[in-house]
A protein has these predicted regions:
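AMP-binding/adenylate-forming catalytic core of the ANL superfamily
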Residues: 4-10, 158, 244, 250, ...
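Gly/Ser/Thr-rich phosphate-binding loop
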Residues: 152-160, 169-232, 243, 252-253
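Structural core segment of the AMP-binding/adenylate-forming
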Residues: 1-48, 363-365, 378
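Conserved pre-ATP/AMP-binding loop-to-beta segment of ANL
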Residues: 51-72, 79, 102-108, 242
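Adenylate-forming AMP-binding core of the ANL superfamily, especially NRPS adenylation
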Residues: 191-195, 230-278, 286-289
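AMP-binding/adenylate-forming catalytic domain of the ANL superfamily
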Residues: 30, 381-403, 421-429
């Protein structure tokens, strides 16, 4: 890369490794770097200096197949990897999401998501460019500041993560919210539960909530055209530009209704990532038998609708039963005192996984670990009742707000962890 775009919050870390970065000519910084910028051997410029536009035609049009950006994976199950993304893939993702949630030149899209994430770039910036609309990019997300920002920007479309949508739906009313009723017609992002979608419609007047799409940085695989009904819990149908299958551990295809690893391959050139930057071995691992192996567990129903089950590394096996951490987390988040949760494995002396729930309580909540466990006994299968529960002030997250489960797995049982075996709880089959 010759030009690097960096958020001011991460610039100091980049300065620390500047001596190892070869070929960089310019660093474009979004925001103000505290304590100034040191001499690092390349030009440092503010993105604000490049505001406006130049209507002069380009002397040379870019090759759609050429490398356009390095977008890093979320790093929730391990170290992040740089995905080599072409310009054509970037536009393909934007067009696919516009089919699911269209907007036009008179719309204003508001997003607080970081621009180093595929969501903000493709769903936000590129989609807006394709329709000729306007985008308002917030430096950060704030529940209390959301509606004032929507009012000030005139936003009619919002692109956020599902967890943020839940926080907003559960927040108290305010004057700006009342004034903006019906202003937002589309909320992009996932996952949104049916209850949260209903709250956005009734409280805020939004009409289209959630993206009904499934994909990774490497490839956007499913979506649903606007207006088509989707079964609850589904992420839509296979995108027509991809061949998507469900495989077992030996790469044999599985029939509808059976869960297995999601694999895909493109039916058109340059709509999927070109591999991981300088990680040929990792690229080879995920491209076994000429299929891209997503590392996700999913299934199709008889009608061709796709359902995400879990990350393969997060899929748990306990007492001979498979447990989806995704489904468990969705159930636990129904408790009014739980704000954030991660369900993950810890090592067991019995050879299988022991289940641990690491959670953050809502401010002021007095919920105990034992009380949460007793609440879960009545709501999850007996084999999914966790052995361990631990409350924390904060959970480790990446810049997109996703919990870094691999860190929690590595930490395992800590001195602050509650053990069901120390209680009087008896789980009945």
């Amino acid at each position: 890369a010759e030009i690097v775009v960096c958020d001011a919050a991460y610039a100091p870390r980049l300065f620390e490794v500047a001596g190892h970065l070869q070929g960089i000519r310019r660093l474009l910084v979004r925001g103000v770097v505290e304590n100034g910028c040191p001499d690092v051997g390349f030009a440092i410029e503010s993105l604000d200096d490049h505001r406006g536009h130049d209507t002069t035609p380009l002397a040379e049009l870019p090759d759609p197949a050429a490398l356009n950006a390095l977008i890093y994976t979320s790093g929730t199950t391990g170290p992040s990897k740089g995905c080599m993304i072409s310009g054509n893939q970037m536009c393909h993702v934007a067009r696919l999401l516009l089919r699911a949630a269209p907007f036009g030149p008179n719309d204003v899209l508001w997003t607080p998501l970081p621009l180093f994430h595929m969501n903000a770039i493709a769903t936000g910036v590129v989609s807006t460019l394709l329709v000729g609309g306007t985008i308002s990019i917030a430096p950060r997300f704030s529940v209390s500041g959301f509606w004032p920002a929507v009012e000030a920007s005139g936003a009619t479309v919002v692109s956020i993560l599902g967890a943020l949508g839940t926080l907003l739906a559960q927040a108290p009313d305010n004057d700006a919210m009342r004034r903006c009723f019906g202003q937002i017609h589309t909320v992009k992002g996932n996952p949104f539960t049916e209850d949260i979608k209903a709250m956005w419609r009734t409280r805020f007047g939004a009409r289209h909530i959630g993206s009904n799409a499934y994909g990774l940085t490497e490839a956007l695989i499913t979506s649903v055209p606007a207006g088509e009904p989707v079964p609850p819990g589904s992420s839509g149908r296979c995108a027509p530009e991809f061949d998507v299958r469900i495989f077992d551990d030996q790469d044999n295809p599985l029939p509808p209704g059976q869960a297995g690893e999601v694999v895909c391959r493109p039916l058109h050139p340059d709509i999927m990532f070109k591999g991981y930057w300088r990680r040929a071995e990792d690229t080879q691992k995920v491209m076994g038998n000429m299929w891209f192996h997503t590392g996700d567990i999913g299934k199709f129903d008889e009608a061709g609708f796709f359902y995400f089950v879990d990350r393969k590394k997060d899929y748990l096996r306990r007492r001979g039963e498979n447990i989806s951490s995704f489904e468990m987390e969705s159930a636990i988040l129904q408790h009014p005192d739980i704000e954030q949760v991660a369900v993950h494995a810890v090592r067991s002396n019995l050879g299988e996984d022991d289940l641990k729930v690491t959670a953050k309580r809502v401010a002021g909540a007095q919920l105990t670990e034992e009380a949460l466990c007793r609440w879960m006994v009545d709501r999850v299968p007996y084999y999914a009742v966790p052995r361990y529960i631990e409350f924390r002030v904060e959970l480790p997250v990446n810049p997109q707000g996703r919990v870094l489960k691999y860190q929690l797995r590595d930490e395992g049982v800590t001195p602050a962890t509650w053990d069901i075996e120390s209680s009087t709880i008896k789980v009945q089959r």
